[in-house]
Amino acid sequence: MPSTIALEKEDHQRDAEFKKVMHGDSAKAAGGVAALLKKNTEAQQIAVDEYFKHFDNKTAEAETQADREARTKEYATLTRHYYNLATDIYEYGWGQCFHFCRYSPGESFYQAIARHEHYLAAQIGIKKDMKVLDVGCGVGGPAREIAKFTDAHITGLNNNDYQIDRATHYAVRDGLSGQLKFVKGDFMQMSFPDNSFDAVYAIEATVHAPKLEGVYGEIYRVLKPGGTFGVYEWLMTDNYDNDNVEHRDIRLAIEVGNGISNMVTISEGLAAMKNVGFELVHHEDLADRNDPMPWYWPIAGELRYMQSYLDFFTVVRMTHTARRILHGFAGILETVGLAPKGTKKTADALARGADGLVAGAKKKLFTPMYLMVGKKPLN
């Protein structure tokens, strides 16, 4: 089913040249701060300007439909520059798997992250030697884990050249380059032929689509008949009321802090799956499970939920005190020229997004893990 929204024209040469100027050889750095300090300042300023032009001086009270349409028209550029700015901060603060998860007693942070990935692979039924597509693969953390868990061959699709370089670097490092490959592309207009993959998954990535029918329709097209697609989707719950300014403020905070042009509700997400032709096998808000600790506890800095002393070094960075210290330090590094301009502004936007995520979760307005599993009919 073709997308009904205007698509951005792709220019891979332009994007590759920009990546080379902005990121240089930082894709091979250790990650996090080490990579962040290697950026080209002028190129980073371009990325900052291109991204924040959609959000600066925009409030929930004053936001118009035209504002949202302007973002969706440049959905690919908005997302690409968001990850030009945020990738190293993500790796520093969270790791190489850019998603949330559920937690169990006695389970460390990274064990929980891996279990969340395994659960999706099991729901889809990914098996050895299957040809699988990861839509919006980030730096390849989930692809590496699922490849090891299932022995499948996974292709990661990403519109950010820097993340593709990092994903490729990590795959080689881990001896997985025979199972993994990473491809540049816009998931609203994939270059793969029809019926190419045995299975497809997306982990908190298709939220960047300007219209879910567009990306789900492309997934349906490239999936083989009888194949299964599974997704952890970011959605506003059906408690969300767009006429409520507080609700809109929470949604806008999540969008600006996470590179999202147009987040929709659970009802709209389910409708999108059905509209493109998927037979829904299962759908569920995993955030509504009766878990002993909430999915958002790390970004809320709720240290009482730590299950391992090693988690402290990850989670302490998320506390409000640590954020203030780190963001102030980033500002100092910018001033003396050791960090590129826009580093603090980006970190502040991510912090605003984290606060929006927590507020949305506590008010039952948002979920980052609405599980949908759909099958493409044989006929």
UniProtKB/Swiss-Prot annotation:
<dbReference type="GO" id="GO:0006696">
    <property type="term" value="P:ergosterol biosynthetic process"/>
</dbReference>
<keyword id="KW-0808">Transferase</keyword>
<keyword id="KW-0756">Sterol biosynthesis</keyword>
<keyword id="KW-0753">Steroid metabolism</keyword>
<keyword id="KW-0444">Lipid biosynthesis</keyword>
<dbReference type="GO" id="GO:0003838">
    <property type="term" value="F:sterol 24-C-methyltransferase activity"/>
</dbReference>
<dbReference type="InterPro" id="IPR030384">
    <property type="entry name" value="MeTrfase_SMT"/>
</dbReference>
<keyword id="KW-0489">Methyltransferase</keyword>
<keyword id="KW-0949">S-adenosyl-L-methionine</keyword>
<comment type="pathway">
    <text>Steroid metabolism; ergosterol biosynthesis.</text>
</comment>
<dbReference type="Pfam" id="PF08498">
    <property type="entry name" value="Sterol_MT_C"/>
</dbReference>
<comment type="similarity">
    <text>Belongs to the class I-like SAM-binding methyltransferase superfamily. Erg6/SMT family.</text>
</comment>
<dbReference type="Pfam" id="PF08241">
    <property type="entry name" value="Methyltransf_11"/>
</dbReference>
<dbReference type="GO" id="GO:0042802">
    <property type="term" value="F:identical protein binding"/>
</dbReference>
<dbReference type="GO" id="GO:0032259">
    <property type="term" value="P:methylation"/>
</dbReference>
<dbReference type="GO" id="GO:0005783">
    <property type="term" value="C:endoplasmic reticulum"/>
</dbReference>
<keyword id="KW-0443">Lipid metabolism</keyword>
<dbReference type="GO" id="GO:0005811">
    <property type="term" value="C:lipid droplet"/>
</dbReference>
<dbReference type="InterPro" id="IPR013216">
    <property type="entry name" value="Methyltransf_11"/>
</dbReference>
<keyword id="KW-1207">Sterol metabolism</keyword>
<dbReference type="InterPro" id="IPR050447">
    <property type="entry name" value="Erg6_SMT_methyltransf"/>
</dbReference>
<dbReference type="InterPro" id="IPR029063">
    <property type="entry name" value="SAM-dependent_MTases_sf"/>
</dbReference>
<dbReference type="InterPro" id="IPR013705">
    <property type="entry name" value="Sterol_MeTrfase_C"/>
</dbReference>
<keyword id="KW-0752">Steroid biosynthesis</keyword>
<protein>
    <recommendedName>
        <fullName>Sterol 24-C-methyltransferase erg-4</fullName>
        <ecNumber>2.1.1.-</ecNumber>
    </recommendedName>
</protein>
